[in-house]
């Protein structure tokens, strides 16, 4: 498995890391400021951005004159902040550690291993319209995930375990959060998908944006090939 050699978001699809594909998709909707939570083999991510032009452009190295020329130089309109969130920190703890970087406005949140054709602007507009703390994207997929119990208006009442392909909705991983979400995360050992989301649902502060289009989570080599 490639994930033993590099962080999962840096596994390549079409000669580009899945992280790059996710960022390019967000950028299409005008989201160009990124905060990336680093952990396992974080230097791989840092080196990718430090040498970004080497990965994306044609380059001439003049060894005799110790110089380098970058051809067809294209700069992404991105501002990328890389944060060391710890090697063994759980998902909730990683979110908690970026508190000082996100400001006081709602922010988008996603994982580094999933691709979808979600309308991100519509997702943000839905989040701002209901006034709750958190919005997750609900997708219908026959795989091994916990599922959502939600009302017609998108209000999530609870989570439960999925036993078979019964048409249940799952958290697709594309989310919008208000800073109030940090109050639901205790510390480094907190798993974001457990107590924080469950308590948000219990308090009536968790909503779901339904997505019926493409969605794929790359948990296995087979899913990468798909």
In which residue ranges do the predicted regions lie?
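Conserved beta-loop-beta/alpha segment of the NTase-like Rossmann-fold superfamily
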Residues: 47-152
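A structural signal for short hydrophobic beta-strand segments in well-ordered beta-sheet cores
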Residues: 10, 147-150, 197, 208
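Residues at the starts of beta-strands that form the adenosine-phosphate
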Residues: 32-34, 133-134, 205
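N-terminal glycine-rich phosphate-binding loop and ensuing alpha1 helix
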Residues: 1-52
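Catalytic-core segments of class I nucleotidyltransferases/pyrophosphorylases
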Residues: 106-110, 115, 120-128, 140-143, ...
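Well-ordered alpha-helical segments embedded in enzymatic catalytic cores
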Residues: 18-22, 94-97, 196
């Amino acid at each position: 498995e490639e994930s033993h050699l590099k962080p999962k978001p840096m596994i390549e699809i079409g000669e580009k890391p899945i992280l790059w594909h996710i960022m390019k998709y967000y950028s299409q909707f005008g989201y160009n400021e990124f905060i990336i939570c680093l952990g396992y083999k974080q230097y791989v991510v840092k080196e990718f951005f430090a040498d970004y032009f080497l990965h994306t452009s044609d380059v001439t190295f003049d060894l005799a004159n110790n110089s380098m020329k970058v051809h067809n130089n294209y700069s992404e309109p991105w501002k990328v902040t890389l944060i060391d969130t710890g090697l063994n920190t759980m998902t909730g703890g990683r979110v908690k550690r970026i508190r000082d970087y996100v400001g006081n406005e709602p922010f988008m949140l996603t994982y580094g291993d999933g691709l979808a054709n979600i309308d991100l602007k519509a997702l943000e507009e839905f989040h701002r319209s209901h006034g709750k703390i958190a919005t997750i994207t609900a997708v219908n997929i026959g795989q091994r995930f916990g599922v959502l119990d939600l009302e017609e208006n998108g209000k999530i009442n609870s989570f439960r375990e999925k036993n078979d392909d019964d048409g249940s909705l799952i958290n697709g991983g594309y989310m919008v959060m208000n800073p109030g979400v940090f109050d639901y995360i205790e510390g480094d050992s907190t798993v974001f998908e457990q107590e924080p989301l469950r308590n948000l649902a219990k308090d009536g502060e968790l909503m779901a944006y339904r997505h019926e289009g493409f969605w794929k989570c790359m948990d296995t080599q087979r899913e990468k090939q798909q």
